């Protein structure tokens, strides 16, 4: 079971870049681990740091700016998460503290991997995303509320509707991964197994 996602209010970090690929999200030299934790420190490594060792933060990069410390909602441009199909990308984002990524579009594999790791990818049209970028620039350190139950993003006095597959929405709201989904049918599985001939058990 994963943490349930019903509604989240958080600080928004604007990453004004299109086609952010998974190698930018988490560079390949940091992929040795097979657990989901510890990747956040390497998120956007080549953009966040001026040196390979990660000791010199780039003051120009959005996540290094004081007003965006503790951001949990990432606002981005189209085709977020393109490139190779590494699941480490959503691992790095969630380990850093992000709960939501808002963009006009996502790479298909990243989109699926995000749901599998309880990271909500919210698709809004270009006009809405442009409005949100303008709002964030005019209101630094602002917060959005992302309501999965109502399928709305609340920013200031405006709300933006988003679509999401009902099955994925159900899984996010109930904190269900593939194991959790299976356990929902545990009684039926046990009954089926008990009905099988002894030699098949």
From Swiss-Prot:
What are the EC numbers?
4.2.1.33
Write down the InterPro entries for this protein, in alphabetical order. 3-IsopropMal_deHydase_ssu (IPR004431), Aconitase/3IPM_dehydase_swvl (IPR015928), AconitaseA/IPMdHydase_ssu_swvl (IPR000573), IPMI_Swivel (IPR033940), LeuD (IPR050075)
UniProt gene name: leuD
Q: Which reaction does it catalyse?
A: (2R,3S)-3-isopropylmalate = (2S)-2-isopropylmalate
Q: In which pathway does it act?
A: Amino-acid biosynthesis; L-leucine biosynthesis; L-leucine from 3-methyl-2-oxobutanoate: step 2/4
Return the protein name: 3-isopropylmalate dehydratase small subunit
Family statement: Belongs to the LeuD family. LeuD type 1 subfamily.
One GO term of the biological process aspect:
L-leucine biosynthetic process
One molecular function GO term is: 3-isopropylmalate dehydratase activity
GO CC term (a single one): 3-isopropylmalate dehydratase complex
- State the protein's purpose: Catalyzes the isomerization between 2-isopropylmalate and 3-isopropylmalate, via the formation of 2-isopropylmaleate.
Enzyme class (EC, first level)? lyase
* Assembly information from the UniProt record: Heterodimer of LeuC and LeuD.
Q: Which UniProt keywords are listed?
A: Amino-acid biosynthesis, Branched-chain amino acid biosynthesis, Leucine biosynthesis, Lyase
């Amino acid at each position: 079971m994963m943490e349930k996602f019903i509604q989240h209010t958080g600080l928004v970090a604007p990453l004004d870049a299109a086609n952010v690929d998974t190698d930018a999200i988490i560079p390949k030299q940091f992929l040795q681990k097979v657990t989901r934790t510890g990747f956040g420190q390497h998120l956007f490594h080549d953009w966040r740091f001026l040196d390979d060792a990660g000791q010199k933060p780039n003051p120009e990069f959005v996540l290094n700016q004081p007003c965006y410390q503790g951001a949990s909602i990432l606002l981005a441009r189209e085709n977020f998460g393109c490139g190779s199909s590494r699941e480490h990308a959503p691992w790095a984002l969630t380990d850093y503290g992000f709960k939501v990524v808002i963009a006009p579009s996502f790479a298909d594999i990243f989109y699926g991997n995000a749901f599998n790791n309880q990271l909500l990818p919210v698709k809004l049209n270009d006009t809405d995303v442009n409005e949100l970028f303008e709002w964030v620039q005019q209101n630094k350190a602002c917060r959005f509320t992302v309501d999965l139950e109502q399928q709305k993003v609340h920013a200031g006095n405006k709300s933006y509707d988003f679509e999401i597959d009902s099955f994925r929405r159900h899984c996010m709201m109930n904190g269900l991964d593939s194991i959790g989904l299976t356990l929902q049918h545990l009684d039926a599985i046990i009954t089926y197994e008990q009905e099988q001939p002894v030699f098949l058990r």
